[in-house]
UniProtKB/Swiss-Prot annotation:
This is WD repeat-containing protein 72. The modification Phosphoserine is found at residues 1093, 1095. InterPro entries: Quino_amine_DH_bsu, WD40/YVTN_repeat-like_dom_sf, WD40_repeat_CS, WD40_repeat_dom_sf, WD40_rpt, WDR7/72. Expressed in maturation stage ameloblasts (at protein level). The lineage of its organism: Eukaryota, Metazoa, Chordata, Craniata, Vertebrata. WD repeats lie at residues 15-54, 60-102, 160-197, 327-373, 413-452, 470-515, 566-605. Transmembrane segments: none annotated. The keyword Phosphoprotein applies. PROSITE patterns: WD_REPEATS_1, WD_REPEATS_2, WD_REPEATS_REGION.
Amino acid sequence: MRGALQAVALWGRKAPPHSITAIMITDDQQTIVTGSQEGQLCLWSLSPELKISAKELLFGHSASVTCLARARDFSKQPYVVSAAENGEMCMWNVSSGQCVEKTSLPYRHTAICYYHCSFRMTGEGWLLCCGEYQDVLVLDAGTLAVLHTFTSLQSPDWMKCMCIVHSVRIQEDSLLVVSITGELKVWDLSSSINSIQEKQDVHEKESKFLDSFNCQTIRFCPYTERLLLVVFSKCWKIYDYCDFSLLWTEVSRDGQFFAGGEVLAAHRILVWTEDGHSYIYQLLNRWAQMGATLRTFSGLSKCVCPADGGVLKGTVYPHLLCSTSVEENKSLHFVMGYMNERKEPFYKVLFSGEVSGRITLWHIPDVPISKFDGSPREIPITTTWTLQDNFDKHQMVSQSITDHFSGSRDEVGMTATITSSEYIPNLDKLICGCEDGTIFITKALNAAKAGLLEGDSLLKDSPCHTLLRGHHQSVTSLLYPHNLASKLDQSWMVSGDRGSYVILWDIFTEEILHTFFLEAGPVTRLLMSPENLKRSDGQILCCVCGDHSVALLHLEGRRCLLRARKHLFPVRMIRWHPVENFLIVGCTDDSVYIWEIETGTLERHETGERARIILNCGDDAQLIRSEPTLSVASETHKHKSIEQKSSNSHQPGPVPCPSVQLESSCKVADASSVPRPFNVLPVKTKWSHIGFHVLLFDLENLVELLLPTPLSDVDPSGSFYGGDILRRAKSTVEKKTLTIRRNKASCSSLQTEAQAKPSGDSLVLGDSTSKFSEENNGIKRQKKMKSSKKAHPKPPRKVDASLTIDMAKLFLSCILPWGVDKDLDSLCTRHLSILKLQGPVSLGLASNEDLFSLMLPGWDACSTEMKEYSGVNLCSRKVLDLSSKYTATLLHQTGIPRGLESHCDSVQQSDAIVYLLSRLFLVNKLVNMPLDLACEIDRPFKMETVHSKARFPGSDILNISSFYGHPKNGGNECRAPEADLSLLKLISCWRDQSVQVTEAIQAVLLAEVQQHMKSLRNTPVSSQPDPVAEHSICERMQISAKMEWTEELELQYVGKSSPLKTSVSPVKHGNDLNSANFQDTEDILDRCVLEESESAGQPRHRPWIAKVCSCRMC
């Protein structure tokens, strides 16, 4: 399990499109939530003065959003649920912008209602859903799992709209639903709770045809408990809820189509149309003589009619009071809603969202009245706003990553439209294909710094970039093959365009090596075959085209191997048969085409259950995402799906289909020997355009690369308790075993990262885990390596130290709250060489399941508490309070070196940066820790840890000296002092208080930087010889062990293993394993010594020395 990745959005000057398809206002009336055709949700701040400002974009859906609804009692949990056309459902915390639950169901919802009866049901309540399927689904509001179905006895059909009726008089709840054929159905919710819990059928209690089609809205009048408003496309009707008798019908005029309505008050309704017009009616002559007194009243059963058997003698007559003013644009489609439950100042608000992305608010008066002559009064627009308004007002901070490169500008001077993008981590190169066919290559880190930081005038004036010209149409796809095929040339790059041309480039010499013409549609995807494909001539390139065809190209041989053109539907998935050399193509209609690569013939075509079995077996699937709604993180998995899926093959157990087993798993990652702490992801907001880029920072990888000792070389078995060197040597095998277990578990979690961590950085990932080999034309597992076999030496990590430090400095520049303390800003710039931001940046988080949340420019425009901090890089006012509390706890800590000299060198700067990053990494881990595991960690707070010898799950985190300082007095045991416990308890309290990860990181960074710079503010410098450099070795090594233990602890939680027993001493473990693997231990020790840097004038890092020696120099 890995924490969330820190993200920084480089928006550019143009806002991403946000075609609104659903809109709602939260119950606290502070946030507007909109769903879009592009699949994103947008959170808009709503001030008490009804001012709007876009706050945050949420990425979680890969299809258009169809409906929104609240998913909890909002006063307790601010949760909103969203549904998409492809069946995806997400539950969002609108306060933090994080997705708390996600599922995918084979249903397309058009309406969702939240229902919870506190005194009759347990759990979080129900989500009642209807849509393009029969009847009504009942979902668990906590897990989004299907609980039951409300079924129809008469005329089952698709349901179009619904509402929940709460009857105060009889204390009963009912569900009213109207089908697409105009049939009204009533279910009793109160009496169905027990039936649903017992899984019994629940049928409707009443039904009635309403003699109209295409119902848009049904609303119950809670003020009279008698009126029922039903809005159809061409008319709206008023019914008596008692017996569903028709009271009035109003037909649309001038070709307008009604889209919805609400009940404003007793006998007053609001109806709106598809083009954004709305009308307020007063219902006159509301009730005539009723005849005999009603003997019964139920919201579910019909009332008793008068004795003569007649119907209601009176009807209602609507009188038009008011209408709303609308900017005339009949080509746009509006989605509208109404909110009349605002707290003080008790506004009644009509709101609308347009396809253009504009939100409009009208303040509805409490008592609408017409003019003196009886004509309707016009209600003016109160507020209107778009995403682009945010960008225009705060354009200074919305720099695109390509704004400073002249090669990306057309003849008019405007920035060229980017249609495809690819980042090469090994070379730190960003490759962008443009609509005019040009491709430019630049240094990604330099481009990001030029767009975000001050003081890079030289870079902005003369940026270093390369232009490639060879395409005559829009470049639609890019691929760097060496990332996926380690045997291919590092200089190769492949691009495809809309004209079905594929060009093989040499990016170093800027030459065209070969041009392929596929004679098909636009090239939409470029994929590499897995390395286990049994071909003597190497790996092949797969091209997916817009006309549903697939082509296979051999890059080294410069020839086309296969053109598959018989697919009737778009290609959804590509699979490879590693033994028989088959290409398996899955289409969106769930059909499968199996092609023989050698001959180019169609082997067979399967549909139905057989096709699903073929698609579901094996682990080498490459998903082809749909272009129009591309989530941010999908680009990460586009090329990495092989290594992520195949990591599951490390797990023991049978494989579903032996014919398509995968031989190797993580070989793809061998092409990159450096972890990816920094990544650049393109976001396609339209089907053919890259809207913006997102910078991703992986704190764990960043800290790992900056440490002098790899994590796998550090003993994670707990602590730096002194002992003798022989025992440390004997326990080396134990360290190896623990690392194996961690890495095997980590393989399955690689998909949670924006970029998978390469296996070259792990000591035993590629050598000691289960391997595969081909025997008798099949693929079987080999057993683990015998202890008698020598382990292959780990290749040295090829890390550009200066590049990694630049990544760390860029991250700190983006996170640091610039502007809070100007003196602190200048000290950071001067002594840490961290450049100041040009303005506040848009921060965000990338979670584990393709879920992103990104702040928008000017997100704090409506925040009253942030007005005094305008222009400050603060994610919230809460950061300052958290930082003060952290500083108060920090002052009681001893043993941790803080403070810089006035003339510090680059080594001291690097050590300070590593220390700051390690702190942020630990805070990120603690705040993101699951609640169950956090409870185990919090348990030692309530016990006497000084005299207790028991080991609790999670209590090891208290004994890691990297977080709390060094072992005191050189003792064998490092106990956390009370001040350190209070620090950990403080961060744990932040998690319980729903503090966001970004807020916690900013607060800790601000407090730590203030402590580091404290010595520079005062003229006298402390004479204590305690510089950072003296402690850097020990401290870094201890940070390594802390990271190891955090991962080990989380893996035990994820794997749901048995509770940890009392830890066994290293002596016993070492003796148990040493009997079989002592020779292997000696090899590792010898190799570790040989691999150490022997440069003159530089100290050689010996992690084991720090464990035996108590002096600070070691």
